[in-house]
């Protein structure tokens, strides 16, 4: 199955190079030169994932993400920020607004492809699990309540970040991150981070918190 991606980048040379690389990897890729053009394309066509720069004319990446999240049919499209804005505060802002991943330029194209495949796989599993939930029994994951901080940490754990990296992004101590991860393991009745990630994806936990 070939997935449809949108690349939002006002640097035409860079956007063309990324597009060609992703096409070689088997993806369909459309290019938008700014956030406004991207928003119009998203309303017109179906995309499985959007890769967006942040600093752009007319509408920047943050504004684009905000607009997407306000429309039901577009709200769940995974968005990756691919940008030179690599400061911790910028990453925190992006994650708090609902971006699914963050890569700083210059980046390894193989890492971008791995992130894309991981997010599409996660989204595909979430969709499949939604269709299977027909039982009258209330599973554990439907009874779970996660605090905003637990939600933030769970998202970053699923993205593959280490406790140290999470601590930097959330401006907290590694010890605090360890405590939150331990609490997540207890709440989900899982033994380690790998099982926690599998449980969260399998049970569509991200869409329930």
Curated annotation (Swiss-Prot):
According to the entry, every stretch annotated as the Response regulatory domain falls at: 4-120
Q: Which residues carry this modification: 4-aspartylphosphate?
A: 53
Q: Where is the HTH luxR-type domain?
A: 139-204
Its predominant location is plastid
List the coiled-coil residues.
Answer: none
Q: Which GO terms describe its molecular function?
A: DNA binding
One Pfam entry for this protein is GerE
Tell me which UniProt keywords the record has, alphabetically.
Chloroplast, DNA-binding, Phosphoprotein, Plastid, Transcription, Transcription regulation, Two-component regulatory system
Query: What biological processes does GO assign it?
Result: phosphorelay signal transduction system; regulation of DNA-templated transcription
Q: What stretches pass through the bilayer?
A: none
Q: Name any GO cellular component annotation.
A: chloroplast
> What domain of life?
Eukaryota
Location in the cell reads: Plastid, Chloroplast
Do the record's keywords include Transcription? Answer: yes
Under PANTHER family, the record lists: RESPONSE REGULATORY DOMAIN-CONTAINING PROTEIN, STRESS RESPONSE REGULATOR PROTEIN 1
Q: What is this protein called?
A: Probable transcriptional regulator ycf29
Provide the species name.
Answer: Porphyra purpurea (Red seaweed)
